[in-house]
Amino acid sequence: MEPGRRGAAALLALLCVACALRAGRAQYERYSFRSFPRDELMPLESAYRHALDKYSGEHWAESVGYLEISLRLHRLLRDSEAFCHRNCSAAPQPEPAAGLASYPELRLFGGLLRRAHCLKRCKQGLPAFRQSQPSREVLADFQRREPYKFLQFAYFKANNLPKAIAAAHTFLLKHPDDEMMKRNMAYYKSLPGAEDYIKDLETKSYESLFIRAVRAYNGENWRTSITDMELALPDFFKAFYECLAACEGSREIKDFKDFYLSIADHYVEVLECKIQCEENLTPVIGGYPVEKFVATMYHYLQFAYYKLNDLKNAAPCAVSYLLFDQNDKVMQQNLVYYQYHRDTWGLSDEHFQPRPEAVQFFNVTTLQKELYDFAKENIMDDDEGEVVEYVDDLLELEETS
């Protein structure tokens, strides 16, 4: 949007519209994973491409309609992936056949085949997988919130300023340095009542809970802060593991490679998606992402529990925090304090163990990063190293190494 191209009369008209318009229906209001509207079921990529075609032709209402549908279809696909992977992960694994203990490779691939069978059966029953699957480029657009860039301008041209403001804000949270959108938002903020419509259309419930918990914390309402923060933690972990599951969706295989290299390439691509989940799910508050979000939640919790003299809950939160920031001097001192008063407060060794969900999250993210770094250094195509042409050269390299 280029505000400089409009005259004073147009600006006056827009100000009147801003006063008169109410916030419209959110694009996810009709969304339901269990009962998605049949009239909206279509391939995600087709809906998105059609929306962009209508956008290019300046058919704003149709563009808005199909952009909103494509956002719902994308959420349906992600939720469907997460649903199947979550259920198949929880499915009990049969005991290996007698004698297989000596064949770890067969056991490994046996588990993979059973998992594939479970996923195939699950996906056959879900409407999201009865459509042709989108390309990785389209999925990347949705991950980057690109549809909101187009929605913002289409809403504006359709005289729906409340939604245009929300779409601009939603896009800016992922692209805080986008100059055009920053200018658009500056213009919107100059309109009366604009602040009422500045909202993240992709916000997660744990973000609202976290903000409420911090506000209660700052107001020294310790119990309220603890209640909301203890709700935010599992809600974030749920979103995180669903994000991991969604990364295991369909992939386009183009290269012709050896069996193990092909599997490794596929898994590295999945890992690349998974290691971005934590960053992508981190709340952005005041234009800045919350640094070390999971650790920060444990930091707030340990102090709030301490203020209520509940050291049996404060100590595990302190130890959990130190998983993510081992060199934090303040938290180390807190832990020394808790250890010193352990008899007074009836603390045992189990109170100085990190919470199980923190250990699981730490282990998963750490191992994923280690695997990805190994693959990046040793397997990925950018780092193929020296090409060996003859067996003698290979033997010589092995001897020198």
UniProtKB/Swiss-Prot annotation:
Family, per entry: Belongs to the leprecan family.
Organ and tissue specificity: Found in articular chondrocytes. Expressed in a variety of tissues.
Residue intervals passing through the bilayer: none
One Pfam family it belongs to: TPR_leprecan
Protein's name according to its UniProt entry: Cartilage-associated protein
Residues spanning the signal sequence: 1-26
Record has GTP-binding as a keyword: no
Gene Ontology terms describing biological process: chaperone-mediated protein folding; collagen fibril organization; negative regulation of post-translational protein modification; protein stabilization; spermatogenesis
Taxonomic path: Eukaryota, Metazoa, Chordata, Craniata, Vertebrata
Organism: Homo sapiens (Human)
